């Protein structure tokens, strides 16, 4: 768990970046500190009290890099979150710190036509990826 001083210094540093959106309201902290773990009678009591101290939505890849570097400098845990649809606590901040929302980074960056290897940003929706692949005569055969 990060100290109050580290968290305050981190938040002050991140507030100056124009490619990061900071969410600090109680409702946001609660919402983004959970996934569907509450379906599990084992995980629910273990994870119910875990809360982020800060939620950050990077608006660019450079913002992700800036956020990760700042968390490292300040010794603040960083938990990555997609859509929060996991049900085993994957996106739960076990030791507080920052939860990073990846939803603003949704692009399909590259499709190699010879290998079929595709590079996407972390918030890319499966629907958007499937549409992109179909436009190139390919299809998503397995959901990662």
Model-predicted segments: where are they?
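N-terminal flexible segment immediately upstream of the FAD-binding catalytic core
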Residues: 1-72, 85-116
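A structural preference for short, hydrophobic beta-strand core positions in alpha/beta folds
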Residues: 22-24, 80, 142
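Residue-level detector of anion-binding/catalytic polar loops
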Residues: 76-77, 139
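Glycine-rich, histidine-containing beta strand-loop boundary motifs that form or position
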Residues: 80-84, 102, 122, 144
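Gly/Ser/Thr-rich helix-start
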Residues: 83-90, 124, 138
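FAD-binding subdomain of flavoenzyme oxidoreductases
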Residues: 107-114, 119-144
């Amino acid at each position: 768990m990060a100290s109050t001083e580290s968290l305050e210094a981190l938040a002050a540093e991140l507030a100056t970046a124009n490619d990061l959106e900071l969410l600090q309201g109680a409702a946001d902290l609660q919402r983004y500190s959970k996934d569907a773990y509450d379906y599990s009678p084992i995980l629910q009591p273990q994870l119910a009290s875990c809360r982020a101290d800060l939620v950050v939505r990077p608006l660019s890849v450079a913002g992700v890099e800036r956020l990760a570097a700042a968390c490292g400098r300040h010794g603040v845990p960083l938990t990555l979150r997609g859509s929060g649809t996991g049900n085993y606590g994957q996106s739960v901040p076990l030791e507080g710190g920052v939860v990073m929302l990846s939803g603003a980074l949704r692009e399909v960056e590259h499709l190699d036509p010879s290998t079929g290897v595709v590079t996407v940003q972390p918030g890319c929706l499966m629907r958007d990826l499937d549409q992109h692949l179909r436009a190139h005569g390919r299809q998503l055969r397995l959901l990662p």
